[in-house]
């Protein structure tokens, strides 16, 4: 497979003029990411009569999340004078799209640049769209960088800069829907690989940069807005939050957000998991499995997904497969087997495909679904474990090294 680094101009993604007025909009309160109650309070604060606030919130919510507008002028059932008032006080601008890459398999990756907060600098994060037959999955980031330093993950080599806000998490979804033509009256880019019918984005996974449960409140707020039936209206059964095992946040996720849960597992004993996923030293497997068994709503209809990266001669033996079955005993679960995706400087190799299939057979025979995830977007560093905002600026030597390890 040849490696493509197509940092093409953003011609494939419709960016309206209003989306680029970022500096001017920075000092204004963004309505994106506010709850309806917070939006009502913001309207009262600028002098909107209290008797009007519920109606105005409904109007704004519809235009922002159903129609997907990013310019108050497009809100056709709001008077021009009221539009001007909103423009003066609020922002609904999108972040800057600093880069877009399109894989040969149709996977798309956007590099989004957010303005500085306080005395900080602008930050960049990556968001990935994975089209499949009948569905389209958007992988969202929750932090800029990560603190967890999982040894097989590229994001773990980028130090944590800061948490993303609810606005910035939601902005990833809004930008992706803009670019894919997933709002009413928008056109899908020519040649784009998307579901033939219905929505272009059917599923959300919090599996991008960062640990979602270390940014719980912002993630919660963003996902509750994304699943609101009067707006973006994504089913909670189609939203999956993935954690490396932040045990205290897991029960809260089920109780307060109610989405599907995925566990970044990758090992069946504490010694190995301490090395692969260092947070295991704080929340070892016994605590993690106990929290899984207590997850609210857990049932055969609401299973936990366990993610297991396949590392050659590290965690891929048939004995490991048998121990995995024992570890998950009694937990309604699905096990995603993930072929390791190489990145510059990684010290691991992907398990041989035949070994992955043998591993899957052991798990399947024990009654667990264990699909092997087909790598998507490897050629643009968009596959699982490959996200890192600095990857858009890889040095030539790193690109050549990546091409060598992908093709070997």
Curated annotation (Swiss-Prot):
Disulfide bonds join 139-384. Keywords: 4Fe-4S, Cytoplasm, Disulfide bond, Iron, Iron-sulfur, Metal-binding, Methyltransferase, rRNA processing, S-adenosyl-L-methionine, Transferase, tRNA processing. Reaction proceeds by a ping-pong mechanism involving intermediate methylation of a conserved cysteine residue. Specifically methylates position 2 of adenine 2503 in 23S rRNA and position 2 of adenine 37 in tRNAs. m2A2503 modification seems to play a crucial role in the proofreading step occurring at the peptidyl transferase center and thus would serve to optimize ribosomal fidelity. GO terms for cellular component: cytoplasm. It comes from the Bacteria. Gene3D superfamilies: 1.10.150.530, Aldolase class I. S-adenosyl-L-methionine binds at residues 210-211, 242, 264-266, 341. SUPFAM superfamilies: Radical SAM enzymes. The active site is at 126 (proton acceptor), 384 (s-methylcysteine intermediate). Its cofactor is [4Fe-4S] cluster. Residues 132-373 form the Radical SAM core domain. Binds 1 [4Fe-4S] cluster. The cluster is coordinated with 3 cysteines and an exchangeable S-adenosyl-L-methionine. [4Fe-4S] cluster binds at residues 146, 150, 153. This is Dual-specificity RNA methyltransferase RlmN. One of its GO terms (biological process) is tRNA methylation. PROSITE patterns: RADICAL_SAM (PS51918). The keyword Translocase does not apply.
């Amino acid at each position: 497979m040849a490696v493509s680094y197509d940092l093409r101009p953003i011609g494939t993604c419709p960016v309206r003029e209003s989306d680029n007025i970022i500096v001017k909009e920075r000092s204004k309160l963004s309505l994106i990411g506010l709850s309806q109650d917070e939006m009502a309070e913001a309207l009262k604060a600028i002098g909107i009569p209290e008797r009007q606030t519920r109606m105005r919130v409904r109007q704004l919510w519809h235009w922002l999340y159903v129609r997907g507008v990013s310019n108050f002028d497009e809100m056709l059932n709001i008077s021009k004078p009221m539009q001007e008032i909103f423009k003066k006080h609020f922002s609904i601008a999108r972040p800057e799209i600093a880069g877009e890459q399109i894989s040969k398999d149709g996977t798309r990756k956007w590099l989004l640049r957010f303005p500085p907060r306080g005395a900080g600098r602008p930050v960049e994060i990556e968001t990935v769209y994975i089209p499949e037959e009948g569905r389209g999955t958007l992988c969202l980031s929750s932090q800029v960088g990560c603190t967890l330093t999982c040894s097989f993950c590229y994001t773990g080599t980028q130090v944590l800069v800061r948490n993303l806000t609810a606005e910035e998490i939601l902005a990833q979804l809004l930008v992706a829907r803009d670019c894919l033509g997933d709002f009413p009256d928008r056109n899908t880019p020519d040649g784009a690989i998307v579901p033939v019918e219905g929505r272009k984005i059917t599923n959300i996974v919090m599996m991008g940069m960062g640990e979602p449960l270390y940014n719980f409140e912002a993630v919660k707020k963003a996902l509750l807005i994304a699943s609101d039936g009067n707006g973006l209206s994504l089913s909670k059964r189609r939203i999956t939050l993935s954690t490396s095992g932040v045990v205290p946040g897991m029960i809260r996720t089920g109780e307060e957000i109610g989405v599907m849960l995925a566990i970044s597992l990758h090992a069946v004993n504490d010694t190995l998991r301490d090395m692969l996923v260092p947070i295991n030293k704080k929340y070892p497997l016994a605590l993690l499995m106990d929290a899984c068994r207590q997850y609210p709503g857990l049932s055969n209809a609401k299973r936990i997904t366990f993610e297991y990266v396949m590392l050659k001669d590290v965690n891929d033996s048939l004995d490991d497969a048998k121990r995995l079955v024992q570890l998950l005993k009694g937990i309604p679960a699905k096990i995603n087997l993930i072929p390791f995706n190489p990145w510059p400087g990684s010290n691991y190799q992907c398990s041989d495909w035949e070994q992955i299939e043998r591993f899957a057979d052991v798990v399947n025979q024990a009654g667990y679904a264990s699909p092997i995830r087909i790598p998507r977007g490897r050629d643009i560093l968009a596959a699982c474990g490959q996200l890192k905002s600095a990857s858009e600026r890889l040095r030539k030597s790193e690109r050549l090294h990546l091409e060598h390890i992908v093709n070997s």
